[in-house]
Amino acid sequence: MVDLRYGSGNIFNEKVHGIGIIALGSFLENHGSALPIDTDAKIASYIALNVSIITGAKFLGVVLPSTEYSYVKHGIHDSIKDVINYIKYLVENGRKIGINKFLIINCHGGNTLIKDEISKLNHENCFIRMENVCLTHAATDEVSLGYAVGILSEDKMKTHDPEIYEEIGMVGLKEAREKNEAIDLEARSVEENGVFLDRTHGRFLLNELINNYVEIVRNMI
């Protein structure tokens, strides 16, 4: 049996090896012209990996399936069961390498639908916590955060307009606005204020999110 040096490297302490970080987003969603279709997955992965590097917790990767409200039609999604089964796979294999606490960083609003199912996975020897970053779809916050992460095309901001791409702020998603008051309020805000890139805000938001999850990991130890 190899004697592993759990105290080596830049880590909070040896106990952090019992914590795993999972990124959750979506891979197949339109985000206007300036952001890629896998924006949510990339932002979640960027944040999760950086939190792992800073704390020493183990980055377990990104969940491939994603789910969505049936009335939000801006991409290709999967069932809640598909998402949960993938998370179960990561958790089961994480436990084989000594992880008993899991932090899921979710950057896709539709995935909040799995909340109740996630709670069912918790038991005495396995704790799972999901934190959500839910920004107005492809609007100012997400554009600015995308810039900070490095996935925004500034040249394509010229055509990043909800009058051209209906999913921006979900302004043109009529059914979603009719069935979800929160979506309608966000869409109204985009209609009134527009969408623009704020580089300073994007960098601030990214640092704030990373620091927030670093503290969550610290408290999970």
Curated annotation (Swiss-Prot):
Q: Name one GO biological process term.
A: F420-0 metabolic process
The entry marks the following residues as binding Fe cation 2, namely 31, 40
- Matching InterPro entries: Creatininase-like_sf, Creatininase/forma_Hydrolase, FAPy_deformylase
Write out the residues that bind Fe cation 1: 29, 40, 108
> SUPFAM superfamilies, alphabetically?
Creatininase
> Which molecular function terms from Gene Ontology are attached?
2-amino-5-formylamino-6-(5-phosphoribosylamino)pyrimidin-4(3H)-one formate-lyase activity; ferrous iron binding
Q: What is its EC number?
A: 3.5.1.102
Q: How is the cofactor bound?
A: Requires one Fe(2+) ion for activity.
List, separated by semicolons, the cofactors it needs: Fe(2+); Zn(2+)
Instruction: Show which residues constitute the signal peptide.
Output: none
Q: Which pathway is it part of? A: Cofactor biosynthesis; coenzyme F420 biosynthesis; Cofactor biosynthesis; riboflavin biosynthesis
EC category? hydrolase
This protein's record includes keyword Zinc:
yes
Catalysed reactions, as listed in the record: 2-amino-5-formylamino-6-(5-phospho-D-ribosylamino)pyrimidin-4(3H)-one + H2O = 2,5-diamino-6-(1-D-ribosylamino)pyrimidin-4(3H)-one 5'-phosphate + formate + H(+)
**In terms of domain of life, where is this protein from?**
Archaea
Sorted alphabetically, the keyword list is:
Hydrolase, Iron, Metal-binding, Zinc
* Pfam families per the UniProt record, alphabetical: Creatininase (PF02633)
Q: Which NCBIfam families match?
A: ArfB_arch_rifla
Q: Report the protein's function.
A: Catalyzes the hydrolysis of the formamide of 2-amino-5-formylamino-6-ribosylamino-4(3H)-pyrimidinone 5'-monophosphate (FAPy) to form 2,5-diamino-6-ribosylamino-4(3H)-pyrimidinone 5'-phosphate (APy).
Q: Which family does it belong to?
A: Belongs to the creatininase superfamily. FAPy deformylase family.
Quaternary structure annotation from Swiss-Prot or TrEMBL: Homodimer.
This chain belongs to the protein called 2-amino-5-formylamino-6-ribosylaminopyrimidin-4(3H)-one 5'-monophosphate deformylase
Organism, scientific name:
Methanococcus maripaludis (strain C7 / ATCC BAA-1331)
